[in-house]
Amino acid sequence: AFPDMVSLSRNNAHNTGQRLGIDRWISLSSGKVLAIDEKRRRIERDDILLEYRSNDRTGAPGWINKDLQIDFLAYAFIESRRCYLFPWLLLRRAWLRFGEEWHHKAFGRELGFTLIEAQNPGYVTKSVAVPTSLLLAAVKNASIIDLAASGSTPSPVRPE
């Protein structure tokens, strides 16, 4: 994924970096260091889970609702050995633009969207399952800035 990578290091500690979403650092030959958050699912499905609530008891936000200090989110399916590498700022931009709509569609189980609740000891983690093709299109379109839009922050172009 990074042809100019010179080193890869793992963040195994429970530290500030981990709280900011950093699981790995990739050093490039230019000297730039990329921060990566990793998400894993055993079996590949036609969707990507976006965790919007980490803990239903405390109300802690899920990772998609946090200002993580990462460059990329690596979303891997273990059995198929396929990994989607999402630029974090574009993924967040897509979520901020469409998250409410996706949540509504998931609540109604429309177009492949579903709500997922993962039981943990003493709490539940909540995610929206977004069809992979729709998420990829939304992230792609998040890279297009509409300079004609009113307001201080231009909106991404809505996928068709």
Residue ranges and their predicted role:
Residues 7, 39-83:
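Catalytic cores of nucleic-acid endonucleases
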